[in-house]
């Protein structure tokens, strides 16, 4: 293979590239997606509070154990994003969660960003912190069994947002994170989330998403990120939560695929959508619609869902040991539905019950 020298000399060896590419491909294998279980202590506390359960380490461990010990989870889940606390936790039998997942053929991942902070010089926009000592942290998580990482940046649609500065800064932060991850053997999941808060229509959501993706992939190129060893975790293109105009699943699918075709290089192995506060059923139906669009789609299109996989699971569990099997059955059902949707083979289901409830949270943070 030809080598590149000078200012464009590769910082990664071929062996490093091969490993990153293989991990990315494993995560986006047909019919599978990611379970995002990386909620911060505060966020998971809100979920536990909804079922009248105290937010303490014991209950958080018990809930994550319920998720990760679900029988046959690996039939539909290829990766799990962990929060740092969860990364260090074990089952009641003393087996580390990371080892439990690896044994099932599921790739453990880690949330590396440290949350959104205000971006000076903008009107209400933010950037994401956590770059300090990131290389050390990434190396430690790789040594501990993780194969990938996630970093979330947030942009909102308003009269004057997202601004040029907001898009540029967040794209560069994502690119710095991605290059550091790859140097330490972790596949970076790049997450530029355009929030669904607002009154904007589908067309504006599509335009903003296209612009954000353009900034992101320019920054990734500037930072010499190896695209074949990355994954993208974007929002679907939907009207704003307060928009007067609604959109069908088919319209959302077409707008989303169109935006991706205009902004995401074919070298990227896969796109793992966030659910963005959609109901469980909408998140699944929209993923199915995206995969059913009759346009060229060079990437795998699958899911990286948190709320849209867990909301009805939490309700089924209710914090009671006698409900664990029922809750795990619910998780397996939702995972299979989304796995089918990632293939464009979701047949739909009854729109009654918890799965149909909106999971929208204004200005949502993890």
UniProtKB/Swiss-Prot annotation:
Swiss-Prot/TrEMBL keywords: Glycolysis, Lyase, Schiff base
Top-tier EC class: lyase
Annotated family: Belongs to the class I fructose-bisphosphate aldolase family.
Gene: aldo-2
Keyword Lyase (UniProt): yes
Disulfide feature: none
Pathway assignment: Carbohydrate degradation; glycolysis; D-glyceraldehyde 3-phosphate and glycerone phosphate from D-glucose: step 4/4
Enzyme Commission number(s) of this protein: 4.1.2.13
InterPro entries, A to Z: Aldolase_I_AS, Aldolase_TIM, FBA_I
Chain sites annotated for binding substrate: 60, 150
Site (Necessary for preference for fructose 1,6-bisphosphate over fructose 1-phosphate): 366
Protein's name according to its UniProt entry: Fructose-bisphosphate aldolase 2
């Amino acid at each position: 293979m030809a080598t590149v020298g000078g200012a464009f000399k590769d910082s990664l060896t071929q062996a490093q590239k091969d490993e990153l590419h293989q991990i990315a491909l494993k995560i986006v294998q047909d019919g599978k997606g990611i379970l995002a279980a990386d909620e911060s202590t505060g966020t998971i506390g809100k979920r536990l509070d909804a079922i009248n359960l105290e937010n303490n380490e014991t209950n958080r461990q018990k809930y994550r154990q319920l998720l990760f010990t679900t029988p046959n989870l690996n039939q539909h889940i290829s990766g799990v994003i962990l929060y740092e606390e969860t990364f260090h936790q074990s089952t009641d039998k003393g087996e580390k969660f990371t080892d439990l997942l690896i044994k099932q053929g599921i790739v453990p991942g880690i949330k590396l960003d440290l949350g959104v902070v205000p971006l000076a010089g903008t009107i209400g926009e933010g950037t994401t912190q956590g770059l300090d000592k990131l290389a050390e942290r990434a190396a430690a998580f790789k040594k501990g069994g993780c194969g990938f990482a996630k970093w979330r940046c947030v942009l909102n649609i308003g009269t004057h947002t997202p601004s040029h500065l907001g898009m540029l800064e967040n794209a560069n932060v994502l690119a710095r994170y991605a290059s550091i991850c790859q140097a330490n053997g972790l596949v970076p999941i790049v997450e530029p989330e355009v929030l669904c808060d607002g009154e904007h229509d589908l067309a504006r959501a599509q335009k903003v998403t296209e612009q954000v993706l353009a900034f992101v992939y320019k920054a990734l190129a500037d930072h010499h990120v190896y695209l074949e060893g990355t994954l993208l975790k974007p929002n679907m293109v939907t009207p704003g939560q307060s928009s007067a105009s609604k959109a069908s699943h088919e319209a959302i699918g077409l707008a989303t695929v169109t935006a991706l075709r205009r902004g995401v290089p074919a070298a990227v192995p896969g796109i793992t959508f966030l659910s963005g506060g959609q109901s469980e059923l909408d998140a699944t139906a929209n993923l199915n619609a995206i995969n059913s669009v009759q346009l060229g789609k060079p990437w795998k299109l699958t899911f990286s869902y948190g709320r849209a996989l867990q909301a009805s699971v939490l309700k089924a569990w209710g914090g009671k040991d006698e409900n664990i099997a029922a809750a795990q059955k619910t998780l397996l059902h939702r995972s299979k539905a989304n796995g089918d949707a990632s293939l464009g083979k979701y047949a739909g289901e009854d729109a009654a019950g918890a799965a149909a409830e909106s999971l929208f949270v204004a200005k949502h943070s993890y």
